[in-house]
């Protein structure tokens, strides 16, 4: 199984974001040991001072493909959810300044949180992400319809397979993760909690 994370197209224009200055979408691959499912605890690592969770809609692919045209993208996934990419933000800024690869800051065990998968037509317009005293709203917006371009970009270079996950549009801003809190992703229209993780 492969896991891909993709920044949002406007991430580079967000002041204070660890992605500030990016001129286009950036993608990176995460090892399968990074997967952390809803209900499992997240233990804050000790190799950096600050960790933040960056929400994203997650697509689960359902078939093999390469060089997939955007118009065929809907044939290649069967379910979606919300997830979060955990990033060592200070370390990422340092690595970017030094022109080094991002992997130490973005690809480590249990850094990819995923919620319960639902059918694509069940995806609401937005989600509320809460952790401790911090919260933000993740607008799904045009990500569902724009997924074809993202899948086309990835599959141009890499063969995708059934079970692969794509975090298709990381929020430009994250939520700090502090021990003793919980990270929850909620549909406020019906109070459905799609992701809930204890931070330890």
Placement of each model-derived feature along the sequence:
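Catalytic-core "active-site belt" of small-molecule-metabolizing enzymes
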Residues: 1-165, 172-200
